[in-house]
């Protein structure tokens, strides 16, 4: 059944078409795109682990906070712009939606240049602060230098791709991501194994592949046949629109900033109790967990235009129906991830490296870290639901609660309780997941009663 591959001629079907059909049409392309992207990251780590060595995996893991910051700024602009444009389309205000597109374009360029330049200048100092040692610093430095030189390309691709998905073209957004991942995998294998460029080759492949994806996205928005596209007379920044984009996009921004901060604390904790290899083990677990989490993110990206449009049109029954269906699917997906990780941890982590010490640390950590995966699925959907309806403050509070209110204190206390050491770091993750889930459920029940 291929109806989800057919481009929507108008986003206004979001208030009339069956919800199940809409979720398939919007979510499946996003899920495929996010899953394939995550699979690329996994395969890239496998290439690095087998083609370079276990310390290279640790070096790559040290770059996660910086990569989270890149994603933080990209998603603040892209997701914020996508949500605002969906709401304007729900109100039948196509001109405002077009203004949002142009503002996203300019913001991505400015933010990409500023972030890339500043980070590149202080790169070594930043990486040492993140926990790099003499053994891992060269790998982390070589990777990030290339990524930062192509930073504007990353910002534009991620930001505009989000808007394309939200304005009625989920299948094109999926194809742009698939194109990027396909090119990335081919180039990474060539650069690492044939040319011998090491971790620098993996980063070069990433930027070149995103350049291909960006050309695809720009071709769409320069076409007058696209429902929302670049037009003369709109190439200027509107303060109100910029403020709205930053406000709604603040939730994913803070999620990623907090994730970066947490990863810094986690990396330092693992370095204290297990050395450089423990950081690499966390990097492997992070890649595996992210694979399933990206499926849920893709699901919520498909939910976002449906919920945002119908909320703007005041069709609250359709909003609730969509939310309940998405939560059910998310819990089911994360349950599958939990079962696979609990039953086959050694086989899963063994794909990344032949190093027995690294695999032992990663397999034991994986079984603990994903213990409450099903609850994470529901919590992520609820948080993104509030973002989709423009309730940025609620979404931000729920995001911060998980990262700062629950996880951070646990990271500082559990390792010292009963000599838990490295296991205290691992156990802080599922415990914070339970607390974050309870907070999200209570908040959702309160809000649904409010709009009944």
Predicted features and spans:
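Transmembrane alpha-helix boundary and packing residues in multipass membrane permease domains
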Residues: 30, 34, 46, 83, ...
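Short alpha-helical transmembrane segments in multi-pass integral membrane proteins
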Residues: 1-27, 85-152, 183, 194-250, ...
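Small-residue-rich hydrophobic transmembrane alpha-helices
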Residues: 57-117, 154-173, 282-339, 343-345, ...
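Transmembrane helical elements of multi-pass membrane transporters/channels
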Residues: 25-44, 146, 180, 209-213, ...
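Residue-level hotspots within the lipid-embedded alpha helices of multi-pass solute transporters
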Residues: 34-38, 72, 112, 116, ...
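N-terminal transmembrane alpha-helices
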Residues: 14-52, 65-80, 84, 88, ...
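Membrane-helix interface/capping residues of multi-pass secondary transporters
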Residues: 45, 54-57, 94, 123, ...
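Helix-terminus/linker motif at the lipid-water interface of multi-pass membrane proteins
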Residues: 39-58, 127-134, 190-196, 257-287, ...
């Amino acid at each position: 059944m291929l109806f989800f591959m057919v481009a929507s001629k108008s986003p206004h079907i979001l208030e009339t078409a069956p919800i199940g059909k809409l979720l398939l049409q919007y979510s499946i392309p996003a899920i495929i795109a996010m899953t394939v992207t995550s699979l690329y990251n996994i395969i890239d780590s496998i290439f690095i682990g087998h083609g370079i060595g276990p310390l290279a995996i640790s070096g790559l893991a040290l770059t996660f906070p910086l990569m989270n910051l890149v994603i933080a700024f990209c998603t603040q602009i892209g997701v914020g712009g996508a949500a605002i444009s969906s709401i304007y389309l729900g109100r039948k205000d196509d001109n405002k939606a077009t203004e949002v597109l142009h503002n996203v374009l300019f913001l991505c360029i400015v933010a990409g240049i500023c972030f890339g330049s500043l980070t590149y200048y202080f790169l070594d100092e930043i990486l040492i602060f993140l926990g790099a040692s003499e053994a891992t610093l060269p790998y982390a430095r070589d990777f990030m230098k290339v990524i930062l030189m192509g930073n504007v390309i990353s910002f534009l691709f991620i930001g505009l791709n989000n808007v394309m998905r939200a304005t009625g073209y989920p299948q094109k957004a999926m194809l742009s991501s698939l194109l990027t991942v396909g090119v990335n995998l081919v180039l990474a294998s060539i650069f690492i194994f044939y040319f011998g460029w090491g971790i620098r080759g993996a980063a070069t492949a990433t930027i070149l592949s995103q350049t291909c994806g960006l050309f695809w996205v720009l071709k769409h928005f320069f076409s007058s046949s696209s429902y929302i596209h670049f037009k003369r007379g709109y190439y200027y920044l509107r303060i109100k629109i910029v403020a709205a984009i930053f406000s709604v996009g603040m939730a994913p921004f803070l999620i990623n900033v907090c994730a970066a901060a947490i990863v810094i604390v986690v990396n330092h904790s693992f370095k204290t109790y297990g050395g450089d290899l423990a950081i690499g083990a966390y990097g492997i677990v992070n890649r595996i967990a992210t694979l399933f989490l990206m499926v849920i993110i893709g699901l919520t990206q498909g939910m976002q235009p449906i919920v945002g449009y119908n909320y703007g049109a005041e069709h609250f029954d359709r909003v609730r129906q969509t939310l309940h269906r998405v939560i059910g699917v998310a819990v089911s997906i994360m349950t599958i991830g939990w079962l696979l990780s609990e039953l086959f941890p050694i086989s899963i982590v063994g794909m990344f490296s032949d190093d027995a010490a690294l695999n032992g640390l990663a397999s034991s950590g994986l079984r603990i870290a994903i213990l409450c995966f099903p609850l994470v699925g529901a919590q992520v959907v609820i948080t993104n639901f509030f973002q989709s309806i423009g309730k940025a403050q609620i979404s931000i509070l729920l995001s911060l609660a998980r990262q700062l209110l629950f996880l951070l204190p646990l990271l500082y206390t559990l390792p010292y309780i009963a000599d838990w050491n490295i296991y205290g770091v691992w156990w802080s993750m599922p415990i914070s997941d339970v607390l974050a889930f309870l907070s999200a459920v209570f908040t959702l029940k309160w809000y649904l009663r409010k709009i009944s």
